[in-house]
Amino acid sequence: MTFRSALAVCAVAACAAGPLAAQPVLMSPEWAQAACTAWNNDAVLTDQLVETGWVKNDKGRGFKVMHVFRKDCGATPTAEMRIALKGDKALCVYGGKVETAQLDRSADYVMSAETARWVEMGRGDYGPMRAMMFGRLEFVGPKMEAMGNMGPFENFLLLVGKVPGSTQSCPAG
């Protein structure tokens, strides 16, 4: 087989395998959309955040907002998730680009960490308490409310490891 025919065989095999699904960039709007779907498939998040009353602290807007970003990629949030009470579930109703400019610090959250730290938390190397205590996760929001929801909060951090996201580049924005 000549080099040219071997190259043709490889090209045909690659096409037959279908396009490679590119992972969204970690903490990008596309990643947040996938994280929203993963949230809705996690019973700890959808059920326990109703049981504790967390989801009801929405200041009358009908949803809570979470902004997330990778600190080594800039100092502003790159993705937004909105969580709302739908029936008897705390469901993610939006995952995408940051749209909510004004957050309410008594209801909403901003979380940031270096990329490597997000990856560690996503693997379950440590939970939210240790992450915050050692400054690995910066957190703005209702701290007492968060303290009462450490189990669900940990599941949110584990979504980072469950939702595919490339760390080779930073989210655009």
Task: Report each predicted region and the residues it spans.
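Feature captures hydrophobic
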Residues: 22-173
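Short, linear, compositionally biased motifs with a strong N-terminal bias
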Residues: 12-13
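Bacterial N-terminal signal peptides that target proteins for export
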Residues: 1-8
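N-terminal signal peptide c-region/cleavage motif recognized by signal peptidases
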Residues: 16-19
